[in-house]
Amino acid sequence: MDKEKIEQAVSMIIEAIGEDPNREGLLETPQRVARMYEEIFSGLNQDAKTHLSKSFEIVDDNMVIEKDIPFYSMCEHHLLPFWGKVNIAYIPNKRVAGLSKLARTVDVYSKKPQLQERLNIEIADALMEYLNCKGCLVTIEAEHMCMNMRGVKKPGTSTMTSVARGAFEEDLDLKNEAYRLMGL
């Protein structure tokens, strides 16, 4: 990440909106924003394979659900935050991921400029590819600042997305059971 470019750009934005980048309260803002971007866009430098390739052998293939995984991301259209919770259900294929690995996978894909719809797809596809599960269902419920503070200005509006792969695409009863266990 080019922190120097970010600092220059933030300084230019401050100036472009009619503020003084040398004013006491804004003097270190470009550096703060650059450090913040390094943190909130850290998913750009990560690979979910690193997290999901370490798995544990199991005897049966019962459904695994990890729900209410908190996340935040930045809308790629306006660079405004959106945040919420991710639910993941999957059917193992004789191997399970450590529970923290699912949360880390959410971080990999959410910590970059993103669309909620794509975030769903990327998490599901990573589970299928790197965990080699028989199927997965990923749901996201999120609130978007681009809906709250600009445009239509509808605070409190929730956006729900859902992606099914493998067994969850093929078996509606399985999909409905996962939704029920997720509380949806």
From Swiss-Prot:
Superkingdom per UniProt: Bacteria
EC number of the protein: 3.5.4.16
InterPro entries linked: GTP-CH-I_C/QueF, GTP-CH-I_N, GTP_CycHdrlase_I, GTP_CycHdrlase_I_CS, GTP_CycHdrlase_I_dom
Pathway connected to this protein: Cofactor biosynthesis; 7,8-dihydroneopterin triphosphate biosynthesis; 7,8-dihydroneopterin triphosphate from GTP: step 1/1
Binding site for Zn(2+): 75, 78, 146
Assembly description: Homomer.
GO MF annotation list: GTP binding; GTP cyclohydrolase I activity; zinc ion binding
Source organism of the structure: Finegoldia magna (strain ATCC 29328 / DSM 20472 / WAL 2508) (Peptostreptococcus magnus)
Pfam families: GTP_cyclohydroI (PF01227)
Record-level GO cellular component terms: cytoplasm
One GO-annotated biological process of the protein: tetrahydrofolate biosynthetic process
Name of this chain's protein: GTP cyclohydrolase 1
Top EC class of this enzyme: hydrolase
CDD domains in alphabetical order: GTP_cyclohydro1 (cd00642)
Gene for this chain: folE
Catalyzed reaction equations: GTP + H2O = 7,8-dihydroneopterin 3'-triphosphate + formate + H(+)
Family indicated by similarity: Belongs to the GTP cyclohydrolase I family.
Keywords: GTP-binding, Hydrolase, Metal-binding, Nucleotide-binding, One-carbon metabolism, Zinc
